[in-house]
Every structure is written in C-alpha cells, then in structure tokens.
Amino acid sequence: MNSPDIALIKTYLLTLQDNICAALAQADGHAEFTEECWVREEGGGGRSRVLVNGAVFEQAGVNFSHVSGAMLPASATAHRPELAGRSFQALGVSLVIHPLNPYLPTSHANVRFFIAEKPGEDAVWWFGGGFDLTPYYGFEEDAIHWHQVAHSLCQPFGEQIYPRYKKWCDDYFYIKHRQEARGIGGLFFDDLNSPDFMTCFNFTQAVGDGFLAAYMPIVARRKALGWGDRERQFQLYRRGRYVEFNLVWDRGTLFGLQTGGRTESILMSLPPLVRWEYNYQPEADSAEAALYRDFLPVKDWLAIKGETH
C-alpha cells in the first residue's frame, strides 16, 4: 500500500492526543486539560488542549490540527519549490510540556503528515516528527533513559535510523545565535516517504507512542524533588532560550503562522513565565554550570550507558 490513508492517520493522531493528555493529567493529579475546538477559515481546524497551573505542570499544551488550503505558504516551498501551486493538507499532534519543578525537564514532541496534490500529477506526501528534551538541571540517568527509548523504537526499522535521526535532532534544535543546543536532543525526522506508506506510518506511530515511555518515568523520578528560588530563577532564564528558538528558528512555528493557523495554539509552546538577564554567567562548578558543561554539548548518551552500567 503506497497511497496515503488520511482517515487512518487522523484516527491515530486523535487517539494519541487522548492518551498523552490522560497520562499527563494523571501524573499531575491536580489540574485537568481544557479543550477548545477551532475551525480555520481557509480550511480545516483542530482540537487544542491545555493544562495550566497544575501541581506538576505549570503549562502543558497538546494540539491536534488538520488544516488544508489551496496553496502552500512560503515556509513550505522554500526548500521544496516543486510544491508551488499545489493544494495541501497537514495533520499533526504537537505538544510542549513546561513543568513547574526546575528539576523536571521541558519536553516537546510532534508527529505530522503532509500531502500536496495537483490534478493530473502524483501526490507528494511525507511524514515528520520527533521528540526532544530540555533539562534545566541535568541527570545522566534521565538523559540515558530518554535516548534508550528513542534507540529502541528505531531498531525495528534499521540500525541506521537512530543515529541518523538523533543527529538531525541535534542539528535542528541548535540555537545558532547562542551557539548552543536547546537541550539534549532525541529524534527528529522529516520528508519521510520511503519505502512505502505503511512503513512510514508505522515508524511515525512508534515515535508518537514512544513519547510517554520516554518522558513519564523522568516525571515520576523528579517531580517530588525540593527546589527554591535559585532553581526557579535559572529555569526561567533558560526558558528564554526556548522562546528564542521557537520564534526565530522553528519551521513549524513559521509554517503555522504563515498558513493562518490558530495563533493561540501555535504559541502554546511558549512558557507562561520567562526572564532574560544581560550577560548571565553561571557560577563556576555549580549545578547550573553543569548544564552547559555536561549536557548541552552533543554527545552519544548510549555510549555513556555502556561505560557506566
């Protein structure tokens, strides 16, 4: 089967949104998700869910969208000029979780499908997605676990998949104007349409389903750790990097805004509180300095597992 089944993809994505929201709400134990269904004037719509002011999660947004249009925006055709003049559909689930506790990392995941069509020509389609982790205070155990889950879900699809998509993630979530990584990476893939539709769909499902397996054990391990104002101030400062990346470099944000997407849903990825400080430098040998020294530089976390276990 190589003709895309959009109904199948949509059913999976809606179920994925349900499952992730249920797991996050259960882990929080205090706040619930509120849901807003919206319609896009140019075609399509979505289902946005957000949890705010929880006991564990300061803000967690989990979006489903299925938008369509008669013509692609500049952000989509810049690196694919052959798509100009085609109608399109884009489906996806995208989420960003900003915990309250600074010892809990921010996490992001996204799985999406895109198809561009023109009468008399073959449809052009692909899958994309991934997940990545942004700690404020790093724990080697968590980083290894995150990458172990990523590696394991990739294995059935080939030995080369994890290293390829890990590198793509490291390269993509790099804040060029800061010359530093946004976090410790994970997986990132795009333009996936080979060898056939079902293989690509199965891999995309593995990534989507892998997110909870990667993130929830970290939540369970760290959510009860005590923290104070020092940790909170550092978390708010580092959240600034998240804002900078999303507004300056992220293709998904630009695509959403250029296609007339729902601004509130697109910018739900931004943290509710953030701060900047001119020329901040962490204290030498501090826990804050360790983030820059031990976690943000790109490394092979699974090789570390082999050395320490």
Swiss-Prot record:
How does this chain assemble?
A: Homodimer.
List, from the UniProt record, the residues annotated as the active site of this protein: H108 (proton donor)
**Site residues by UniProt (Important for dimerization):** H177
- Keyword Transmembrane among record annotations: no
- Its family? Belongs to the aerobic coproporphyrinogen-III oxidase family.
The segments labelled Important for dimerization in the record are 242-277
- What SUPFAM superfamilies does the record tag this protein with? Coproporphyrinogen III oxidase
Q: Where in the cell is it found?
A: Cytoplasm
Question: Per the UniProt entry, what species is this protein from, by scientific name?
Answer: Yersinia pestis
Spell out the protein name for this chain.
Oxygen-dependent coproporphyrinogen-III oxidase
Q: Which cofactor does it need?
A: a divalent metal cation
